[in-house]
Amino acid sequence: MASGLGSPSPCSAGSEEEDMDALLNNSLPPPHPENEEDPEEDLSETETPKLKKKKKPKKPRDPKIPKSKRQKKERMLLCRQLGDSSGEGPEFVEEEEEVALRSDSEGSDYTPGKKKKKKLGPKKEKKSKSKRKEEEEEEDDDDDSKEPKSSAQLLEDWGMEDIDHVFSEEDYRTLTNYKAFSQFVRPLIAAKNPKIAVSKMMMVLGAKWREFSTNNPFKGSSGASVAAAAAAAVAVVESMVTATEVAPPPPPVEVPIRKAKTKEGKGPNARRKPKGSPRVPDAKKPKPKKVAPLKIKLGGFGSKRKRSSSEDDDLDVESDFDDASINSYSVSDGSTSRSSRSRKKLRTTKKKKKGEEEVTAVDGYETDHQDYCEVCQQGGEIILCDTCPRAYHMVCLDPDMEKAPEGKWSCPHCEKEGIQWEAKEDNSEGEEILEEVGGDLEEEDDHHMEFCRVCKDGGELLCCDTCPSSYHIHCLNPPLPEIPNGEWLCPRCTCPALKGKVQKILIWKWGQPPSPTPVPRPPDADPNTPSPKPLEGRPERQFFVKWQGMSYWHCSWVSELQLELHCQVMFRNYQRKNDMDEPPSGDFGGDEEKSRKRKNKDPKFAEMEERFYRYGIKPEWMMIHRILNHSVDKKGHVHYLIKWRDLPYDQASWESEDVEIQDYDLFKQSYWNHRELMRGEEGRPGKKLKKVKLRKLERPPETPTVDPTVKYERQPEYLDATGGTLHPYQMEGLNWLRFSWAQGTDTILADEMGLGKTVQTAVFLYSLYKEGHSKGPFLVSAPLSTIINWEREFEMWAPDMYVVTYVGDKDSRAIIRENEFSFEDNAIRGGKKASRMKKEASVKFHVLLTSYELITIDMAILGSIDWACLIVDEAHRLKNNQSKFFRVLNGYSLQHKLLLTGTPLQNNLEELFHLLNFLTPERFHNLEGFLEEFADIAKEDQIKKLHDMLGPHMLRRLKADVFKNMPSKTELIVRVELSPMQKKYYKYILTRNFEALNARGGGNQVSLLNVVMDLKKCCNHPYLFPVAAMEAPKMPNGMYDGSALIRASGKLLLLQKMLKNLKEGGHRVLIFSQMTKMLDLLEDFLEHEGYKYERIDGGITGNMRQEAIDRFNAPGAQQFCFLLSTRAGGLGINLATADTVIIYDSDWNPHNDIQAFSRAHRIGQNKKVMIYRFVTRASVEERITQVAKKKMMLTHLVVRPGLGSKTGSMSKQELDDILKFGTEELFKDEATDGGGDNKEGEDSSVIHYDDKAIERLLDRNQDETEDTELQGMNEYLSSFKVAQYVVREEEMGEEEEVEREIIKQEESVDPDYWEKLLRHHYEQQQEDLARNLGKGKRIRKQVNYNDGSQEDRDWQDDQSDNQSDYSVASEEGDEDFDERSEAPRRPSRKGLRNDKDKPLPPLLARVGGNIEVLGFNARQRKAFLNAIMRYGMPPQDAFTTQWLVRDLRGKSEKEFKAYVSLFMRHLCEPGADGAETFADGVPREGLSRQHVLTRIGVMSLIRKKVQEFEHVNGRWSMPELAEVEENKKMSQPGSPSPKTPTPSTPGDTQPNTPAPVPPAEDGIKIEENSLKEEESIEGEKEVKSTAPETAIECTQAPAPASEDEKVVVEPPEGEEKVEKAEVKERTEEPMETEPKGAADVEKVEEKSAIDLTPIVVEDKEEKKEEEEKKEVMLQNGETPKDLNDEKQKKNIKQRFMFNIADGGFTELHSLWQNEERAATVTKKTYEIWHRRHDYWLLAGIINHGYARWQDIQNDPRYAILNEPFKGEMNRGNFLEIKNKFLARRFKLLEQALVIEEQLRRAAYLNMSEDPSHPSMALNTRFAEVECLAESHQHLSKESMAGNKPANAVLHKVLKQLEELLSDMKADVTRLPATIARIPPVAVRLQMSERNILSRLANRAPEPTPQQVAQQQ
């Protein structure tokens, strides 16, 4: 490894640098690396002990300059001085310039006598800033003087002082190198000249060193070897220069023809032999020869290129630095190891030893190589080329080197281009002079490789004269018999160049061996001996390549050597990926039999087959698709840009007009015709085109020729010309589309899949074009997979239209934009980025087909074109108006829009609205209004109303409508048994996942999903598991053994039998599966059975997919089966030649299955289509099929906002239910498997398919009559048929249940199910594992204590019946849902007469087009919610109370309680209010959880408060009215007694004691109802400055409410959040003002007191009806025991007791105080509103419902509430005033109740404030204020009396009070942040809200009445 640090020297080119290096290093390197023959030469480059340079240490006194920079500068200065002194002639300069220019990687172009030139090469532009800076400095310092100045002259010129030091002998002995000298002298110069610039210091030091070396008296001593070498070098250079100037070059010596160069190479293992080396002139003895070292250069430390080096290198550098000279060093590596970083020790030590021996002669050398890698432009450890100045990292070479190569090495550039740099130097005069001086020539030691390029071994090698390659003569091909005479060029140098750039290698083959080489007879041979046998050549590989920019017509064969030389990377990659020993078979032509026949008939095809097709080139790639453009060259020849069929646009190529290509003339004619049509160009350049038969394109009329509103009765002539015929319904579609165009109505064509929407659209656009309505351009946006189909349809139906497909990568699209968008060259800016098209530019095409993605990606170009019409295929991509596609398309300039979709109502109305909004935003812009309009009406009305609105915009036909004669389709669900192997794996999967299954409440949805997927795999085939696949028996070719494969799966057993019969019947089959691995297994199965097949899955795209379809659909095709993956086999695939579809495993999403079987049931189908859906009996598959079917129903039948769009995901409960399905039976079987005589028992339920059953299954006539009548968009539901003969046992009892379609059963899940089923198996399995694994890991037992006490229930009763929905023996079970009446809602099972015995209705069902939840229809669900909002939580006896409103009276108690339980579970279910459904799939219907829970809480507080005082206050507010009412009733004996029932409470409830409220259904405990009586008492104690809070007798009269009262109360938002009521100061007024005050309430602004909960107001007539039917009942729920007792009490003064302990947080008590004072004084107890009225208001709310003010006022029991308003009855807005006052008053009471509850809880939790707390300090201040005010009350009176001193004191007191109050006010503002709040429930229970709700939503430990009811 050799070379210098830092950037190369400025005099690095040519001999100038060598001279400089000679002086610097005291050695003389040759001017050219090859001149080692010269005996006079001091050192041969190849034998130089390339010692590493010594690094210069940083000077402590000059820290500013980095070492590397300093070294570079020193070196550059010395270079200039020494170079200038050498007196080179102009020849050297010229030569140097030439070399510098020839090398594009030199570091500098500096030459003496000239200013430095900056190279223009691209690589130099990357020069770092530091380099540029240095070069600028160098330029500044560069002076043009030819003579180097002495140090004294330099210092004098600069005006600086010279040093006076006289060098002693000791100095000359010790300062043996420049480094030591510099360290000694530099401080002396710096001391004299402290401000000397670094560059000047370098120059002075250089001059001083030169003078010092010249004057050194010890030149011969070893101590001064370096100085001696330097002097010798100077002498030699001078002699060289003199010779150059004086002597002319010697004339060439005439030599006889010489042999070609040879050398003794060194193989990898060869020993090193000694060889003479003319190192020092006087030393003639030969020195041992060594392998020529490889130079490796370490990049400059100062540059950005980092040097990476190992520790070994660093050590070597350090050790070699001691002997290195000045600023250059060499690192050598000649070892066989190829690593430049870690060299072999042996070699290193050898080099060091040699260096030490020859230290007198050499101290290193400097090369003129670049110091950075040619490839990456970075520095570091680089490998130097021996034949040019380039350098490389080993990793940057291709292929990268692992180790440094041995000997001389040439870089890839030299190997490719030949040696130029070295050849130039060969002729340098310097070398010739040295050769002359040397005299004797020695054996040449050159740069040629030390080993054979072919076999990599040493020995005698033949060397090439123009490159470093060496060969054995026997390794050449053909071998040479002897060394040739004269100049010899190796195969690499004689290798012909390639004709272009290779794009890809297609195939390779063995070529013909070259002709053998004759061996000359030896001169001394016997003439009779036969001639020697000629040397045979070897066959070499030939590669068939495609050329860049050329078509496949130009593909040709090239030799391996050509590829290796010119395409190294591509060749290496090809070698890596392909077998290079055995050429690939050229069997690409497809069916051999067909191609053989065709070859016999068509000689042209035979030729093409021989030349191209057999090597993998498809015929389509050589067929012209269209000509895109033309160009004319200087000679007038025309070239055409051709786009080839089935190849992207970036493979388009230019071809000259006279190339022979099939149909070329036809396409040229077509190109010019189109050009003429679009631009009116007549003339065309080039040769005259041959006459070809081509239909002349007719120019479309300028004005419309046909009225588009007139219907076509038959298809027009221009369609007849295409050869196609439209179906009648397609003609109708065409007429409708044309009419809509004329009317300017944008439309949606929503025909069902398979009715030819693409054809209708193509014909519609063609008709616009042909009739002159529009010439386009038309934009079609479609899914990428269907674009090929669109191309075909346009080709077929619109032959005159120019259709461009704008798809592909950036390059393809750039070519399309340049050539296909316009005829004008500059219409669009070129390049890969899309840009706008010029406005005035004409458009070249009529139709542009593109994908959704490109609409947004290339919106710049597409958005700049004015489109006549937009067509969006599969338009449900526009269903979201927030999508980018929607927004971008909205910005396009579109005159007309047509959307195509097969499922316009796929999910919900919102999506339909977005489609309409896109079409006509001016009409459909209000989404909310649209949804509201269609939100709550039955389906039939909804569809009809929608139809009226959509009529002008949408056309939708179903196959059932338009093809009365189209073959029907029948879908049968075929239930299949698990094979024994599948059962084993099924049980194993369940057992292995026991812990995941058993984590009650905590089971992860993802883990359950994984279990389901594993079980689905098991149902398909056990070989889908790696373990089973490994153990499975295989055939020698690696395929599974067929019989074992079939036996392992129940489905394959059945499939085998079915396919056999289907094949015999001449049917063809599509088999769909979700899993591609299953398709692999099916391939093996079909191979085993010997059926031919095609396959499409997600990995097969575009053209390959279409080819497979075409092969299958081709007439007479042999393929019997087509394997498709369910999702990949979706859009745009037409397989109408098949008539049987087998869905091997159902997709999660039923839409995908429907799309799948629509592939066969479509236009073109002329046979009945049978669809067989395989479902494994009693497994997850069966359950998934049921759930998917029900979800599908829910999605389609309930066309309402929100529902259905997210039904794809399964809830945890659903997953758990799916997993449980059939497991009990599976494990039951296991128990009976022990006995051998269980066959008969098993047979009863196991499915058997014998020949008879298979025949019945495949019978195609079984359902024909029914299927033809299928109607409507729910056709897929009706097609779910059940093969009734499949199961031997049939449940006859379920036949009657046909009125209700069950969508989902109520979950009644046994939490211990998995525990009971799997615990034993799991523990057994763990024991087995432990036994097998030794001690193993401890298994933690999974015990769940949460739900342990829950009763066991058989979940199968309600949920997953062992027999699926499909085992019903009626095929009509799923049909005609819409025709059912709503009356027989619940199933009536035989023998079940009693309501109690009736089973609960299913959780979700559909009746008459409406969804029912547990038997509750939409109206009943709404009524239930209204009742909740009106009365709060239903009490235990709600079923017998006023709670049961009219709509709910038809429900049994069991159903009612079940629904209450479900409703409360939903309320407590965690999840967003925005979700469309609850976790169990029940529609949410806009339920707001917060509002409902708040209302329930408030009503509960009111009920509890009324119950507390009810037994004291009685049930009549004015007892005297009770008798009047009774008398009225007596006079109307026929009328029913009014019911006044309320929730039951024990009659002996004590005062101030909350009556117990029964626990809420479903285990939900509302906290308000479970508090203790101490709480209320505690809370009451906290009330301050209010009237007495014990029972108040009715004799007290309340004070009137004043006009200016203002109450601001926030509604209760939650338990913790209670706002303090703001109270405005009140003033007392006389009692007469009360009615006025009440009347003027409406004038008071009350912005805060707004009820956030919705108030549900029901029909008043309904209410009256209810009231007539009510029974007499107390508020506590009891009927009055003794009415006489009541009568006796009426004359006695009635006791009254009521209080709300709000702690003074509201103004309620101050109001009460004032009101009661007024009432007492005026004796108007009834007329002035006070505490008594408030109680009866709350009692009325409990009885009549929340905010039912009118009902309460009309009830005689609450007549007291009307008394205060009697004076206002004459006012017009009397009712409004009264209701407003009641609402405000109730708000205040509601707030007080909430605060009381909070205080009660605080007391219950023993919450108290710290005495030092700010609130307590506030309390103290308040006491001070109170004390101050009370103690100085007398001052007020005295001051009023005129006492002046008292007046002064009063002022002081008032000031004190004011200060105290302002302090308190400041404290109050800070108070809310500091008051301790009741911690939220979540904190107290240390559970998250989600966990609490989950626990509430689960069933309670003890059985609730609902559960009991369900079990009954």
Swiss-Prot record:
Tell me what effect the entry lists for R1127Q: In SIHIWES; no effect on interaction with HDAC1; no effect on nuclear localization
Q: In which tissues is it expressed?
A: Widely expressed.
What CDD domains does the record point to?
CD1_tandem_CHD3-4_like, CD2_tandem_CHD3-4_like, DEXHc_CHD4, PHD1_CHD_II, PHD2_CHD_II, SF2_C_SNF
Q: What top-tier enzyme class does this entry carry? A: hydrolase
Give every Chromo domain span: 494-594, 622-697
Composition-biased stretches (Acidic residues): 35-45, 135-145, 311-323
Q: Name one GO cellular component term.
A: protein-containing complex
What UniProt notes about the protein's domains is: The KIKL motif recognizes and binds the NET domain of BRD3.
Protein's name in the database: Chromodomain-helicase-DNA-binding protein 4
This chain's source organism reads Homo sapiens (Human)
